């Protein structure tokens, strides 16, 4: 997986690409927390999905999101 910034993630999401999101303090290979797949479903916006994800994210794992795509 390749790490990308939020601007690139937003552009790829609008094109219909699969984006993975993870709290910023969690390592990518962590066995307890795995990346969550986000994709366009039912017309939900990128910001709506990310805001919902961040609202329920434990603060011990980070306060921001890290975005990834498959190589």
Which role does the model predict for each range below?
Residues 19-70:
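Acidic, low-complexity, intrinsically disordered interaction modules
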């Amino acid at each position: 997986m390749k790490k990308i910034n939020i601007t690139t993630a937003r552009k790829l999401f609008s094109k219909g690409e699969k984006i993975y999101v993870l709290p910023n303090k969690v390592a990518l290979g962590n066995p307890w927390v795995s990346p969550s797949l986000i994709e366009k479903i039912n017309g939900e916006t990128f910001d709506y999905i990310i805001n919902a994800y961040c609202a329920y994210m434990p603060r011990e794992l980070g306060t921001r999101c890290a975005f990834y795509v498959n190589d």
